[in-house]
Amino acid sequence: MAYVPLSGSDVRIFSDVPFSNDYKNTRWFTSADAQYSYFNAKPRVHVINECNFVGLKEGTPHIKVNKRIDDLYNACYMIFRNTQYSNKWFYCFVTRLEYVNSGVTNLYFEIDVIQTWMFDFKFQPSYIVREHQTMWDANKEPLTNTIDEGLNYGSEYDIVAVEQYRPYGDLMFMVCISKSKMHATAGETFKAGEIAANINGAPQPLSYYVHPFYEDGSSPKVTIGSNEVQVAKPTDFLKNMFTQEHAVKNIVSLYVTDYIGLNIHYDESAKTMSLKDSMFEHTQISDDKHPNVNTIYLKEIKEYEEKTIDTGYKFASFANNEQSKLLMYPYCVTTITDFKGNQIDIKNEYVNGSNLKIQVRGSLGVSNKVTYGVKDYNADSTLSGSQKLTASLQHSLINNNPNDVAIINDYLSAYLQGNKNSLENQKDSILFNGVMGMLGNGIGAAASAATGSAVGVASSATGMVSSAGNAVLQIQGMQAKQADIANTPPQLVKMGGNTAYDYGNGYRGVYVIKKQIKEEYRNILSDFFKKYGYKTNLVKMPNLRTRKSYNYVQTKDCNITGNLNNEDLQKIRTIFDSGITLWHADPVGDYTLNNEVI
């Protein structure tokens, strides 16, 4: 029980004081004069000049008031002065009224230790459990506060925004990889089967052809160095790849990708792209039977480049809320996905800077591989640029879906190509043997005629016909074999995977999906944070007056010192450990008041 003096003077009993001895709320003042003026302006129920307090020994301090109990029904607060404390004002709660007789009432009270000693105790750095904090910085950006509140926020999210981002808009790249070159370099004679080793991130022996195209089947205008190139349609490119003799069975991989590992200059409105002539060259794949196919050949790439896509303000699209913490995880989350089984969740507050930027990396490998990472995510400011780039890989979406285009193995073309020389040799041999057989039989017939042997002449003539007939039959048999092969259905040696589904349905690049908790829970949590602030869990000086209307403060084993008795000091510590709202404006308890940071 708080210490009570033996007597008091200038006792004033008030009504309409809006807080009680549960110490959930109190009025917090900047000066003793402001404090006195506040209470002295309250409606007076009764005034006593001098009185002695009774019941102190029993722990039930009270005064006798010469007034009917009905006249004191609304008495809730009392102040008095004591000459032993330099005329200090003591502030008290009226706790109970007791009927004595028709003209006398016992008024029980207890000392309001907060108001009585408000300017006599001081906080030292203490462990702050929760309090009202600064929510926004000078640029109106939410300050990071992700301490778990332990509150229910529901089990489902509302999707508030879905945006698709592709490295080059509608532009895609078909990458064709062959065992050997399928074209002749300008000024040189084409050599089938020529291995063209080069640098593609690393030394390698394969030949790479890059064919840009759009969803509608058209192709962009391409500039390589200073030369303009109009590449063929993707369908024409594919058609020729599987009909030209030196291309059949030469292709080892064929896939579609959004990014080839180079931050090329691309103008989406003009549908033009520019490539460096040190890396690429314009080529024509052709033979003597089919039209030329304009495409792009990879000469050399020593190092790949990343491309940065700025998706805009990281907190855009989320519901406006005066509570900045509701923009933090888990109340808001951004998901980056390609809808192909690759997905990462991003906590927006850990993205350095105001905008969410995605870094795209890729390559011209034997299959598709593109990564999408969040720039400067969880990256300390002490890291260098290259270190930040590497660190972002830890939070990347890796799309290594094959995106293959089906490769057709035309058995007839392959047979003709692989056996071209032997087939010609067989034909020549058959014809030569047939002719020689005819000549031999012809000489035999002439000899028989010279000797007058009619049987010999007839036999040799029959041999001539037989030799010629056998040659024709052998050639016909060889052609029949080719016809049988031609009737064999073309086989898929490499399936197209889900490329048609993914690209046909527009699943390209990545999607940035913003999600937040349901409105019901947003409202519940907003009201809670508005009333009780945020968890702090820091040793610091408490925020006793940082808001316009009220501050909530809760401590643990708080460190308070002051020039007052130890019993009251301990009670003050207990009050702050239990949590109390310090009101700076009236009406006390009105949470609709403007409570902006001051």
UniProtKB/Swiss-Prot annotation:
Keyword Coiled coil annotated: no
Keywords tagged on the record: Late protein, Pore-mediated penetration of viral genome into host cell, Viral genome ejection through host cell envelope, Viral penetration into host cytoplasm, Viral short tail ejection system, Viral tail protein, Viral tail tube protein, Virion, Virus entry into host cell
Cell compartments where the protein resides: Virion
The keyword Cell division appears for this protein: no
Gene Ontology biological process terms from the UniProt entry: symbiont genome ejection through host cell envelope, short tail mechanism; symbiont genome entry into host cell via pore formation in plasma membrane
InterPro entries noted in UniProt: Gp9_C (IPR048710), Gp9_N (IPR031772)
Pfam families in UniProt: Caud_tail_N (PF16838), phi29_gp9_C (PF20934)
GO CC terms in record: virus tail, tube
Sequence similarity: Belongs to the picovirinae distal tube protein family.
Known partners and oligomeric status: Homohexamer; forms a hexameric tube structure with six flexible hydrophobic loops.
Purpose of the protein: Distal (knob) tail protein that plugs the end of the tube before DNA ejection and forms a channel perforating the host membrane during ejection.
Name this polypeptide is given: Tail knob protein gp9
Gene behind this protein: 9
